Amino acid sequence: VVLEPSAGTGLMAILAQIAGGSLILNELAETRADLLSSLFPANPVTRFDAAQIDDHLASGAVPSVVLMNPPFSVMANVTGRMADAAYRHVASALNRLAPGGRLVAITGANFGPDVPAWRDAFTRLQERGRVTFTAAVDGAVYAPHGTSIDTRLTVIDKLPVED
């Protein structure tokens, strides 16, 4: 079972579906949620704020994989930038993830365990899982999709952390 908490237009969800995953789709924005409902008619689309996805999904919705590209600095119902928006989304999705599951996140390039401003946040995340991979990704990779923002790919396995 694959959860995409901020599913957007389904670019990652379709890959999970092609790979055989059953989908849990969530998208707060009405237009994108309607598009997802059209593209994935067999899957209900919820419209929760993904920063609190763990609090809102049905108790039986427990994914073994989370694929996410959360907002980098935008929060629902908040005016202005929120520096910890990506962290809130990742933390809530990690809470929802099944033990032994894997979370894969595309975030802003500066959201990483080696960045001093995020070290404490990643220490807290590692109480629930271990970061098994993280790497910056040059924004040019995304040019075909209309953006060139530098990002980071981070993989967190929900396994006990080794001391």
Protein language model regions, located:
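Short, surface-exposed, charge-dense and proline/glycine-enriched linear segments
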Residues: 33-38, 79, 135-140, 163
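C-terminal lobe and adjacent flexible extensions of AdoMet/dcAdoMet transferase-like proteins
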Residues: 156-161
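Conserved Class I SAM-dependent methyltransferase catalytic core
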Residues: 80-155
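Conserved S-adenosyl-L-methionine
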Residues: 1-77, 86-88, 95, 100, ...
